[in-house]
Amino acid sequence: MMTLVIVFGIGGCSLPPNENHDRSNSLQTKTKWMNDPQADLNIENGLTAFLALDDAFLSIASRIHLIRNAKHQLDLQYYIWNDDAIGNLMLHELLNAADRGVKVRLLIDDQNGIKLDKALKALAQHPNFEIRIFNPYKFRHLRFIDYIFRLKQINHRMHNKLTLADHSIAVTGGRNISSEYFDAGDQFQFSDMDILFYGKAVERAEEVFDEFWNHPLSYSTEQLLGQGTAQQLENLRISYKTLDQVNTPTEDKLEAAQDYLKLRLENYPIQWAKAHFVADHPDKARGQAQQQQLLYSQVLNIMGKPEQHMELVSAYFVPTERGTAYLNQLSKDGIKVRVLTNSLVANDVAVVHSFYSQYRKPLLQNGVQLYEFKPNIERKKRTWYEIATGSVIPVKGKNRSSLHAKFFDVDGKVFIGSFNFDPRSAHLNTEVGLVVESDHLQDQITAMLDQHLLQVAYQLKLDEHGNIVWCEHKDNGEVIQHHHDPESTRFQRFTMNVVSYFPIEWMM
């Protein structure tokens, strides 16, 4: 009986035709966003201003700053947009922008699930608010059927993260829209990196958004969810206003972060450099992109082969045999190669660790420096918020944490974006990022890693027998050596070893 139901469902349920859906492009009206008297000249000379955002609250504040100050248009593109405090805060801010006449376009990958469907359906009723869903599942409430019969199609996801305002200023990086990416989760936090940029590189970012927005894999909410009603939109307004009336520590920190960010943009010198927005073509989600349309090809062309050093931070690191050979050869050629990724217990996608772990020993044997992010981080320094407000945030033990950042630098060129060093980012998902040609930014990143790496990560080495040891550096100078993945159980290690034999590395 179940077989008949599934077969009948497959025959009777299909996505609506979408090849000729309404096309729209970004408005070309630009807004001035900073008080730099040289800004216009720098942009004419092909330069881009940038501000790296390693602090979670400054990162969410930058997005809210763009939304609240946009005058003409907002374009947002995300892989995950959760139905939580941060997700609803951002939707409310976008609704407020639409109310004051700003054109809002929101594109979300359908891997996000159905929890936001009700809100998205209501928001799409607003005349200034357009919402599309990328590469949707046919069976929205029985998604396992898609995994069985449409794996080739739904295995490609839009992993992009991008916020654009007035065709002038943007934020990209590794963070999705969810509380755990912005230090607002109750039990779990991601450590991540974004970058705010203004100037020449934004032009390409807007072109990329339009390519995805107008692609046949982007479906309107009306096509997938049906038409919403004015009453549904009004009910959503009421729920957002109710949430607004509850003042939380998160709201206080966000207000302080926005003030701090505004001060930085208006009164502090902002770095300018040549920068390149890079992205996969949306046809990659169909497996049809040409080589030159792939992000990693664009990055290699811009950054070139390392001559002095390469620092790589990747939440999900599966170098494959080819990538391992490449990194090993760099190290043999005398180039300093330093890699930071998640430890087994820190990794929120544990199966990825199964296919990374087999490459650790060959990398170490050839001189590649390897570090693994600890699953529990104790905060050692005062945050910008404590310094700016004179307050002290109490620390209650350790926070469960995971590395989610994706950035690397090669000889004065820095990439910050959504791309992980793994087969999924290279061949399956679409990705975006910004390459900045800046010795200053590279020096900042190198100094940050030098200062904090031994605090937040285990240093991997080989002992006299050629076995891997995990070195945990304590504040008092003591070094504790672990002889298996720290804080893991025997069952976890056994399971990861078994999974590593499955022929699915190409999906990682």
Language-model segments: residues:
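Bacterial N-terminal signal peptides
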Residues: 2-9
